Amino acid sequence: MRHKLLILSLALGLFTAPFICAQNKDAAKKNDKNSESDSMITVEQAYLNSIEGVMIKEMVAAEGRDSKRVALQYIEEALNQGRQSEEIQAALSTLATEGLSTVIREDGRVVNNYPEIRRRACELLGQMGTDKAKDSLITVMYTDNEPAVITAAVKSLGEIGKNDNDEVFNMINWIARKFDTVNPTSSLALEILNTFEKMSGSITNKKEMFETVMRIANNYNYVTPVRTRAYEVMRGISNSSSNTDQKKNK
């Protein structure tokens, strides 16, 4: 109840802030229409971001799936409008491991296991595109076992595109081998192939990448389109590597 009241009050503050700041800007224009107006816009944006960050933090901390879903909606809107902050980063990192890093039990049953929340948080971390987002996604892949969540994390890592010292490749390759043995999942295998294709230029350990792609191609637990895609990726990577070698020899 306390969380709901606080969220409502914060939301009211967020909605009324533009009107308050607009009045302040009108007064400022009378003194200096240029510099003061720019200053007020900066203050207004900082105020809105602060309110937004606090509100998102409270919704993430509140119990229940609905508050976390609303938090994700606020975060998505902020990212679509080009607003990023430490609060948003922290909120997404928390939501991406909801039910894993912090477990709430009632009568011995986990009541905060929300795979769909974690999956969506992973997608938005990809939209963040920061080093911290990359690190959060790698943490998800270490701790989560839900194929849908892991698939979203793999896709987001491919979109971020950071792979210093094969850090991201090694993580994805480990996931590929793990699920290939324990729980072959066609949708995950397909996303791994797509990500390998995107990242192939930055991957140093080409040998292990080829081995993983070929293992997917020869694993009949995967549907035919996925195995066909594996051969396509293999050919594409091989041709790209050959062209690169030819350029180096010229």
Question: Could you describe each region identified by the protein language model?
Answer:
Residues S9-A17:
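Bacterial N-terminal signal peptides
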Residues D144-N145, N221-Y222:
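Short coil/turn segments at helix-helix junctions and helix-capping linkers
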Residues K178-P184, F196, K250:
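Mature soluble domains of exported/periplasmic/lumenal proteins and thiol-rich metal-chelating peptides
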Residues P18-A22:
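Sec/Tat signal peptide C-region and signal peptidase I cleavage site
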Residues K25-K30, N34-A62, Q81-D107, T130-Y142, ...:
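Amphipathic alpha-helical scaffolding segments comprising HEAT/armadillo-like alpha-solenoid repeats
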Residues M1-L8:
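Bacterial N-terminal signal peptides that target proteins for export
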